[in-house]
Structures are given as C-alpha cells and as structure tokens.
Amino acid sequence: MPHDILLNTLSANAPHWRALPLKDKIQLLDTMVIALQSLNVEGHLEWSAASLRTQLMDPVAQELEGAFEALISVSVIKGQLTRLRSTLLALSSTGAATRPKSLRVHTTSKNEEQIIAEVFPLETADKFGPQGKWTGELWLKPGHEATQASCMVEPAAGDAPAPTRVCVVLGAGNQGFLTLVDALDVLFVQNETVLVKHHPLRGYQDKFMRVVFRPLFDRGFMGAVFDTTVAESSALVSDPRVGHVHMTGGKATHDAIMWGSSQEESADRRRRNEPKLKARMTSELGCVTPWVVVPAVFTEKELLHQASHLAAVLNANSSCNCNAPKCVMMSGTWAQREQYVEAVKSALRELPPTPPYYPGETGRYDRFRQAYPSSSHQIQSNADVVRRVRVKAHGGSDEDGVAANGVDIGPTDLPFLTIDMEIEADGTCDNNYALVNEAFAPVVAFVTVHNAETTTSFMEAASNICNEKMFGTLSCTVILHPTTQREYPMETERLIANLKYGTVCINAWTALCYAVDTCAWGAYPGEDPKNAESGCGFVRNTLMFDHVQKSVVRAPLIDQAQVVHVMKPPLNKKENVVDIVAFILKPGLATFGRVVLPRCCCSRLFCGSLAMVLVISCVTIGVLASGVLKQ
C-alpha cells in the first residue's frame, strides 16, 4: 500500500501525541497561528482563488467572492485555533476546560433533566461586532453531567495503554476550510493523530494546509494524501492501523465505506449487521434543511430583510452546502406568505447565479424538475453574468460541468429552481420527493402547511414534519418574530426543544451558527448506522463538552450578521474585505486603522452607511480587547 510509511509513523506516534503535555500542545497552536499569519493576505487570496477555480469561477472577474472566501476561511480557522488554545490553557492552569457562562437545567417532555450550557457570548470580545447580540447554547444529552475534555485526561497507572491507531479524515468537497476544521477537532479534541485524504475537488489545498499544520507534519502527528484511486482509498480506511474514520460528505459515500459499494454486499452486510468498516466512524453528512417561518405580522422592513437574507444563503456556493435551506415551511393561513415568497424570488433575481461545479449537480437539479413538472419554476437572474472559466477540477463527466482546463465556454449557470408544495399538518402530501431527497443544487421548495390554523398549532405541526417527514437531522432555522416570542414564550421554547437537529438557529442561517466557535456542529445524536442520514458525532467542539445533543443559537430578527454575506456597501469592495482579513490575521493598531479610518473619512465609499463604520469599529475594538486573539 502506498501509504504504509505514513501510517506506520502516525500509528507509532499516536501514544506520544495523546500523552504530549498540554503546554506543548498550546505551543503547537501558537505556532500554527503564526503559520496562518505567515501566508499574509496575499497567500489567503491565492488559496481562495484556487477554490474559485474549483467552483468554475474566474478569480479575476470574481475577486470580491474570492476576498469573502478568504475572510470566511481565516475567521473560522483562526477562531478555532485561538478558542482551542484558550481551552487547553484553562486545562493546563486549572485542571478544567473553559467553563460556560452559566448552566441551567431544562426538564424534557419525558420529564428528564437536561443541562444547557450558555457558551456565547463567553468573553468580552464576543459582545462586539455583527454577532454581538447573539446568544449560543450547548444542550447536553439528558441525564448527563456537564463534563468536559475526557479525551485529554491522562491515563492512570495500570490503565490500558494509549491507543496506537490513526484517524483518517476524508475531506469535504464543497468547502475548503472544512477539512482543516475537522483535522483540528480530531487532533486537539479527540486527541488522535490524523491522516487527511483530500477530496478530489480540493487537492489544491494540500500545500496551504502543510503551511498551517507544518509543526504537526514535522513531528509525525499528521499526514495527508490526495489523488488516490478508489481502491487505494478503500484500502486506506480498512487498514488495521486505522481506528477511526471521520468524513464530511454524502450519505452514498458513507454507506459505501460502512457497508460496501454494491447493493448486494450492502444489503447482505446490513442484514447480518456486519459492517465492512471495522474502525469507528464519525461523519457530517447531508440534510434537507428546513427554514420554518412562524406566522406573525412583519413590517415591510422586517419581511424584506429576512427575504434578502434567505435569498443570499440559498444562492451561496451554488446551494451546495450541507446547511443550505431546502424547504421553506409556512402556514397556509399566514397573511404575508405570498408577499414573503415573492420577495425571496425577487431577491434571487438580483443575485448572480453560480456555476454548477459539484459532481452530479445538474443531474440532481433535473430530477427535481422531473419530480415537479407543473409546480417548479426557474428564476432567471437579472444580474450581469460574468463569463466563467471552466477548469478540470475533478474526474467527472460533462454533466458535472468539467471541460478542458482554461477553456472559456461562457455562462453555464443553472437558474434557481423553486417548487411550490402543499402539505397537511399531519405530514401527508401528494409528493414528498423534496422532503426526502437532498438536492445539493440550486433548488428550494416553498412548503405551505394546511390545517394548522393557529400559531401554536403551526409550531407543533412544523416540529413534527421536520422530525418525522424530512431527511436529515443536521440543522434547522426558525424565523421567530419578537412578538411571537413574547406572546408564546412556553410554546416557542417547546418548539426549540422538540426539534431534533444538531443545530437549531433562531432568525439566521445555520452556517452563521457554525461561525460561533463555542458551539458544536454535527447531526442530532441517535441515528442508526444502518440508515445514517446526517451522520454521527460533533466537530467545532472547542469547549470539549463530552455529551453534546445540539447547539441552539438565537439572533435578533434584524441583525447585521444576517446580511454581511449579501455584499452590500461597504462590503461590496474587495479592498474593504481584504482589510478586514488583514486585521483578523494580525490584530493591531495598524490593521485597525486600515479597516476604520479611510472609511470614516470617505462618505462616498460608505454611501452614508455610518452604521457599518460603527459595526466594523466594534468588531476591531472587540478583537483588540480579547486576550484570545493576542499573540
């Protein structure tokens, strides 16, 4: 096997990594932050340009998208590094991980006690910036104490020796930073050595990852491979030196690894309950993500704000995100339903479409059109479509949107597909295809729920439909007007408690919850490995809680963070976004000045948006005040 040497090294070093003193791991994290900074803004823009080419986009024509991708990657990766450092520092100095702001006890519908840890805001800096008004909670499994960092406890004398087996991380194909985040979690939270296998779409990121993770590569705690054949990949995960496989990807890949690639083998192994994979498997798979709009009287400003928010997240990354909203659920008696749907469609028309770059995307899109021939509609974009450059990003077919490297064959975008669906409060409907099939394509269903006449009956029906009739348990958004929360406090809390999703977000896209780096991300616990949907296990668990059930994040109905990705002034200029990237990389007065001062002095650039100046000022002051980000 080609990877024998790597596996031998990682296996031999696994006990050393597990026993490595915390101060040494903290030093490694510090070195990694310095390495992340060493790429400078230019290096991160080069990284994002490679990602854009993978997405069949021209990095020159789409320079703003490239700057935003750099902003997201830098924010997520540095946030995780610094938050892990804070947790390990607390463990080292006090013997306990960073504690939450507070703990409270919730009594479940089964009369069980459940601990809820309030984890955001955790520090002063968390209260500043676009997410300053948000709150984040970790709900633990009922009956468990709020224990943390069990994997970091040194074995007592006489205990079994530390494991010598390796974790293989199978990298995501739709977002570059996900692989790095997964590797960080396995290394520092689960305390295992890691061999990363890059996704065929993302092999370009190997050189960037080797810069950031260099101290771990140098000491034999981490390795990486790409361009492996199917046979080599299968042999890799089946190797006896591999004790854990973690993947971010699709259900079909998960099932092929776990149960076998052929239908016959898979069915036989499931029947005998004999998985093909002998190692432990954790995963973050897909979901038909609900976007539940609880009926209320919204002002025009509130309605248009949330419509713009939804349209932007639908369009992001060609809608190839595991948390892309796929079913917008509304009450049939909501007076503003048609106005809201038309506002979302109108906002979609103003957004430039993204190319169908992901393997099989066009085929999945067509299958949804075929499933709903009379109730599906294509939204034609009014935005200027920049000519795309297709690149040979993977070994797919022409259906996947792959042509010869560098050949400009013009716009090949898929118009956004909307589907009108009707469903009864008990979950019955004429055609449930959109509820049980993840599109991973620019498709969304507007689902009208009938016979749920009141606000409370709609909330109950929506919860039951999401839990019982829809594919996946990864994440869910609920749009809750403040008046609804005031008028129905017990009912809204019951809705949040009853939703069986690993992340429940109030009033915002769940990807923005992923950015709250004290919350965990993963499927709701309890999925059957024989019929996995959204997976098993959590990542981004920087506070190292042992028994996470789900994250709950609450945002205001109107909030700057909800539309930061819409690229409105001043974030519609590459240089403005790049300055923020520079500040996040190296917070200091010089980078602070580049973010704030030129914008304060140039009202034409800001188009009068003093509010944004204040937002950015709060972000930067908060970061400067935070000991977490200081070097």
Where on the chain are the PLM-derived regions?
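Structural signal for hydrophobic packing residues in well-ordered secondary-structure cores
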Residues: 14, 33-36, 40, 44, ...
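PLP-dependent aminotransferase-like
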Residues: 166-168, 178-231, 268
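N-terminal Rossmann-like NAD(P)+-binding subdomain of aldehyde/semialdehyde dehydrogenases
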Residues: 1-145, 185, 198-203, 212-217, ...
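Conserved NAD(P)+-binding/catalytic subdomain of aldehyde/semialdehyde dehydrogenases
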Residues: 166, 215-329, 526-532
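Short loop-to-beta-strand entry elements in the cores of soluble alpha/beta enzymes
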Residues: 28-29, 190-201, 225, 277-296, ...
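C-terminal core of ALDH-fold dehydrogenases
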Residues: 27, 457-565, 626
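Long, low-complexity, polar/charged, intrinsically disordered or flexibly structured peripheral segments
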Residues: 112-160, 395-405, 417-433
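NAD(P)-dependent aldehyde/semialdehyde dehydrogenase
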Residues: 296-297, 316, 322, 330-474
